Amino acid sequence: MLKIQKLSIAALMVSAVISGQVFAEDNTFDEKAASYAVGTLMGSQMKDLVDSHKEVIKYDNARILDGLKDALEGKVDVRKDEKIQKTLESIEAKLVAASKAKAESIAKQAKEEGDKFRAEFAKGKDVKTTQSGLMYKIESAGKGDTIKSTDTVKVHYTGKLPNGKVFDSSVERGQPVEFQLDQVIKGWTEGLQLVKKGGKIQFVIAPELGYGEQGAGASIPPNSTLIFDVEVLDVNPKSEK
């Protein structure tokens, strides 16, 4: 019951507050106020839980309160009640199924948007496509030696999705990034070898040359086409030993 277990956080928070302080005898301590405070703490945690599930399950607040009351009065033990255990398991199964369906929908949409974007991009002026399927447009070729996959490059870049959303940008951070070229996604490794130091290039990376069906975190869905604008600031060849 991964989602359900969030409720135990309330108890842990109270324990942490109490154990972190030393209380002297205080005859003015208001137990009713303390009881209410604990109730609001648990209620806040419960509200977060209910809100996080609302797209999938519409809970009945009155029944939630009934359950709380019964548990507090010792009328029910969730650890021993098989009916409640089965209900909690069904909640988790429903949430997992909904999460899977949502992920599949997002991946499908990302693929469709990417396919459409690449088809249109391919028609653009000066756009070329490599044998692997990498699409690119060179703004400036740069000068010097051809970049190798084992070289360390220093670049400024902006990465976008087909819908225009920027998911990462060293330009916005104001801090270039340095890395060995064969340690990144295939599209980058291939794309930067098409220019030299000082070069500027835009490349469009199909999912199979990027993060594929896995995606990358919350910002890059599975099956995403990636658009990068890159400027090569410096190139350091791998030293020969």
UniProtKB/Swiss-Prot annotation:
Its EC number is 5.2.1.8. Keywords: Isomerase, Rotamase. SUPFAM superfamilies: FKBP-like (SSF54534). InterPro entries: PPIase_dom_sf, PPIase_FKBP_dom, PPIase_FKBP_N, PPIase_FKBP_N_sf. GO terms for biological process: protein folding. It catalyses: [protein]-peptidylproline (omega=180) = [protein]-peptidylproline (omega=0). Transmembrane segments: none annotated. Residues 150-241 form the PPIase FKBP-type domain. One of its GO terms (molecular function) is peptidyl-prolyl cis-trans isomerase activity. Gene3D superfamilies: 3.10.50.40, Peptidyl-prolyl cis-trans isomerase, FKBP-type, N-terminal domain (1.10.287.460). Coiled coil: none annotated. Pfam families: FKBP_C, FKBP_N. Belongs to the FKBP-type PPIase family. PPIases accelerate the folding of proteins. It catalyzes the cis-trans isomerization of proline imidic peptide bonds in oligopeptides. This is Probable FKBP-type peptidyl-prolyl cis-trans isomerase.
